[in-house]
Amino acid sequence: MTSPIQRRTLLLAAAVLPLAGACTAWSGAGSQSSAEAQLAELERASGGRLGVAGFNTGSGVRLQHRAHERFPLCSTFKLMLAAAVLERSTRDGSLLSRNLSYGKGDLIDHSPITEKHVATGMTVAAMCAATIQYSDNAAANLLLKELGGPATVTAFARGIGDQTFRLDRTEPELNTSIPGDPRDTTTPSAMSDSIQRLVLGDALGAAQRDQLKTWLLGNTTSTERFLAGVPAGWKVGDKTGSGSYGSTNDVGVLWPPAGAPVVLSVYLTFPQKDAKGRSDVIASATRIVVAALAG
């Protein structure tokens, strides 16, 4: 038989439990609201337009700012390009090992790897690594030519469920980043969702997915962007991008030492054509997202 004191204790516990749950939910919502405010202030202070789409792949919690607005892709398209090559390789077994010949006329600004191999050419796989890890522009154009042009990469994006990504031109023209120009753009939300499907989901076969992840983890261009914004011990697999109007981007996956990875896309652009890139803003946005989603 339950005593009056026990009954009162049980009733009090029953009353407190919903309040505890409400406090937890409020705390999480408050943290996210604070992070959203921090991103808005970061954008205001930068003088540009900032787009952010991050989500914790374990909890599903998202943090967004202008996540559904279009931003210039710049070199972040190269992640989708490499994925399209990997998908094609499942139907063309010799593709990755195929050696592509090219001449000095194919070299354009920022082609640090291809310029060293004009005499011998490079394999498709080596070009994928060069365009992801060093943002080699000539390699990107040669890969686009091998696949069939920018429209082929857009078609690949549609095939994995991305209705937003569009690639219209090649390097370096695709980096004009003119405000309001829909060419060569995507939204942070669409890019993050595609990255999740490609790197962590089943849009690619297991071997192709592992290869894409390996290329991304070997990126060398993120020192002042995602890498500058994550805590010590985190791994970053990403693709950066830069263009006119101060366009400064970074997209990819952030792996904590323990726990679920965070998928993140950050895009920044300015109204002035001669604006300088702001890698520091990308790093600051990364810190805000990581603190909110994985803290």
Question: Positions of the model-derived regions?
Answer:
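Structured C-terminal helix/loop/strand segments within mature extracytoplasmic catalytic/sensor domains
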Residues: 2-15, 30-40, 146, 150, ...
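Short, glycine/proline-biased beta-turn/loop segments that scaffold the active-site neighborhood
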Residues: 91-116
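Active-site SXXK
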Residues: 60, 72-100, 264
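Mid-domain, small-residue-enriched loop/turn segments at the edges of structured enzyme/sensor domains
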Residues: 46-49, 144-200
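Conserved catalytic neighborhood of penicillin-recognizing serine enzymes
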Residues: 107-143, 150, 184
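Beta-lactamase-like hydrolase cores
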Residues: 25-72, 288-292
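Soluble periplasmic/extracytoplasmic beta-strand elements of cell-envelope proteins
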Residues: 51-56, 64, 80, 101, ...
